[in-house]
């Protein structure tokens, strides 16, 4: 049995009519709208009313409670970009921007103060920079490209963190949504890239005072511990979702001890992420890093609470003692 549906924009402007099987899904409807009216599938948000919520692609049309009989509403989400592309740009930017302040200190801090630097060649961490580093620094008034121990090791750990994120995007993450509005690319990149410049300026500053040795090693341990924990959670979440599907299951710990945090929070990947930046704060002794950690905690808490609520709504047997992101607190 076929359904005759009136397709209307959420603004109230009619688009046209679609004839489709009553057993068809929202995904099928999107494809028909694309065929007939050339509105890209990824740009469509199908709703049961002008102010209704976005219907899932797997939802059958005949099971939707339409506000107006035989009428569906479409919101154009605008130009889209792939999630993987967004993540690659988000995470590659901080490596290159941090590297710029690391490799060209004379251009940002002046030449004379850098003569007090000691120890390590900046090229060791960022060998992929194709620019004539020594020549550019000479133009800016100096030639010595040596950095103090704290900045050197912080640069290594910074690169490990964002390099890990890039590799996870390529080989680990499975996205429930293929695309996102292209506007979000500028918003997300502004956040990551802006903080990369802000942190790099302070951590690499020749007058930056490194923390005590014991605090540095404590910070390194916390950072690396949380990086491994974060990766462990991402691998577990990948294994929960079969490739090519949007299946959702209750995440529970596996044999990896780092996943035991699922006993306490719904989004332990965010917990570990925050922990990494607490560790980076300690190992650098840099207050701007702590500001970045708190900014990240705020945003991740918003995301975690949203995901936590979805889990509890979707799964009646969801563990009641779990918090969203911080054990026993939030």
Predicted features along the sequence, with ranges:
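Internal transmembrane alpha-helix with an interfacial aromatic "cap," most often the third helix
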Residues: 151, 155-180, 196-206
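Eukaryotic mixed-charge, acidic/polar low-complexity intrinsically disordered regions
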Residues: 23, 50-75
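Hydrophobic transmembrane alpha-helices
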Residues: 100-104, 208-330
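Short amphipathic, charge-patterned alpha-helical segments
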Residues: 19-48, 69
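Juxtamembrane membrane-interface segments at transmembrane-helix boundaries in membrane proteins
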Residues: 72-82, 117-149, 209-215, 248-258
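Short, contiguous acidic and Ser/Thr-rich linear segments
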Residues: 10-28, 53-56
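Interhelical loop segments of eukaryotic multi-pass membrane proteins
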Residues: 107-133, 241-248, 315-320
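Transmembrane alpha-helices of multi-pass eukaryotic membrane proteins
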Residues: 81-98, 148-161, 179-192, 210-223, ...
């Amino acid at each position: 049995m076929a359904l005759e549906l009136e397709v209307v924009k959420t603004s109230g402007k009619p688009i046209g009519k679609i004839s489709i099987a009553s057993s068809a899904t929202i995904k099928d409807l999107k494809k028909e709208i694309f065929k007939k009216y050339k509105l890209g599938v990824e740009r469509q948000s199908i709703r049961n009313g002008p102010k209704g919520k976005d219907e899932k692609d797997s939802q059958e049309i005949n099971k939707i409670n339409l506000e107006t009989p035989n009428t569906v509403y479409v919101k154009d989400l605008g130009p889209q970009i792939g999630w993987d592309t967004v993540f690659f740009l988000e995470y590659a930017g901080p490596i290159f921007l941090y590297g710029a302040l690391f490799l060209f200190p004379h251009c940002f801090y002046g030449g004379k103060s850098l003569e007090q630097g000691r120890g390590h060649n900046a090229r060791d961490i960022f060998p992929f920079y194709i620019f004539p580093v020594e020549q550019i620094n000479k133009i800016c008034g100096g030639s010595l490209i040596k950095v103090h121990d704290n900045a050197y090791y912080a640069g290594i750990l910074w690169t490990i963190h964002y390099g890990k994120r890039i590799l996870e995007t390529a080989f680990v993450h499975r996205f429930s949504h293929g695309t996102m509005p292209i506007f979000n690319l500028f918003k997300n990149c502004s956040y990551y890239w802006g903080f990369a410049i802000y942190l790099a300026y302070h951590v690499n500053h020749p007058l930056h005072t490194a923390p005590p040795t014991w605090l540095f090693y404590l910070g390194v341990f916390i950072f690396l511990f949380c990086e491994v924990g974060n990766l462990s959670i991402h691998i577990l979440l990948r294994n929960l979702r079969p490739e090519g599907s949007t299946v959702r299951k209750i995440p529970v710990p596996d044999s990896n001890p780092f996943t035991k945090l699922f006993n306490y929070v719904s989004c332990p990947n965010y917990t570990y992420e925050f922990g990494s930046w607490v560790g980076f704060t300690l190992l650098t002794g840099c207050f701007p890093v702590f500001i970045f950690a708190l900014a990240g905690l705020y945003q991740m808490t918003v995301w975690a609470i949203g995901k936590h609520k979805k889990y509890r709504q979707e799964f009646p047997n969801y563990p009641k003692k779990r918090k969203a992101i911080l054990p026993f607190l939030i």
